[in-house]
Amino acid sequence: MIGIAEIKLTDNEIEAAIAVLKSGGLRQGPQCNAFEEEFAAHVGAKHGMTSSSGSSALHLPYMSMLEPGDEVLCPSFTFIATASMVSMAGGKPVFVDVDPDTFLIDLADAESKVTSRTKAIAPVHLFGNPCDRPAVEGFARKHDLKIVWDAAQAHGAGYDGKDVGSWDDVVCYSFYPSNNM
């Protein structure tokens, strides 16, 4: 059977994991705080906050910004969480075509999907390739939309010398083993 990922851990990593397990604090402890600070600094973000999964990382901003029935533009080629977290927050995902060469969100198609209920756009960086930041930000400004960037497959990716993790409004990562890191 072909596995999803081969786990290769150093002795130091194993010892660090054991120390956390022995501390009894599997969440919100000093290691978690240190990781949040170090990862935020690594990607150039002002703040970093961990969650239990990439899906929950996407759910949190939608809970804070959407009213029931608000729409979010989502690429049609993505992991299910991109749209399902919009629905879980009471919003309505509106699917947008993707560019056939990059599989990234097609802003020309997105233009035709904007309504008075559209509140956000959810561009997904795929395969380590970042979305066109100036184009997405210009689109969002034009339509007064928030941006929830899905960077689950873009650890270390950048655009014009800026890590995707430093972009506004919200950037969400996932550390699931099948994501490229």
Where are these regions (language model features)?
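N-terminal "arm"/small-domain region of PLP-dependent enzymes with the aminotransferase-like
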Residues: M1-G25, P30, L145
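Solvent-exposed, non-membrane alpha-helical residues enriched in polar/charged side chains
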Residues: I18, K22, E36-A40, H59, ...
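Short Gly/Pro-enriched turn/cap motifs at secondary-structure boundaries
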Residues: G24, K142, S178-N180
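PLP-dependent aminotransferase-like
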Residues: S64-A151, G158
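Phosphate-binding glycine-rich loop
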Residues: G25-E71, M85-A89, V94-D97, K162
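Conserved active-site segment immediately N-terminal to the catalytic lysine
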Residues: W149-M181
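Conserved donor-binding loops in enzymes that form glycosidic bonds
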Residues: E6-I7, D97, L126, S174
